[in-house]
């Protein structure tokens, strides 16, 4: 998968034979002409053909559109659930953010390109251990935002009370991305905590899971419920 990413980035930089970039220097617009030599085009074309073939490879099928949503969405449920499976019991729950999911997966065949569209970042899966107070801050973060992708528990918010399966645990193991683990999207409760890296990119985990499943039937399951609101 690393080789695919490298080729993808290389071809992105040299994807057009002719192009014009307008550069603004503060006083005038400067037109810069970029023209790729035909010899270079001949060199990269075979790579592009192979890359297109790989990116358009069908790896699974979904019976419905997978989209983001609040309080939950099929796309978030799908990615959190498969990531928790990938952790093989090392984590109690999984948490991501809607902002990190960049596209939908439409009903029908799923290609590798579709997964790159959803997850274009090189985010790695990590596990962080939170104490009870920090965990409650995480629950409040999710509910205050009207819902963010998570799995491994049900969350019920009723008035000022937030309940989940792990409220009484002294330590809760949270699976997330290294970006969020470093405080991304205001997840400050993760900052400074030890990160147990699983050694796998989130995008690769999604692709591997899809390759193992002929058909995906993803449902909404009321994993986040707001009562009396």
Model-found features: residue ranges?
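Post-signal peptide N-terminal segment of mature Sec-exported envelope proteins
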Residues: 24-45
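A conserved active-site cap/scaffold subdomain adjacent to cofactor or substrate pockets
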Residues: 68, 73-74
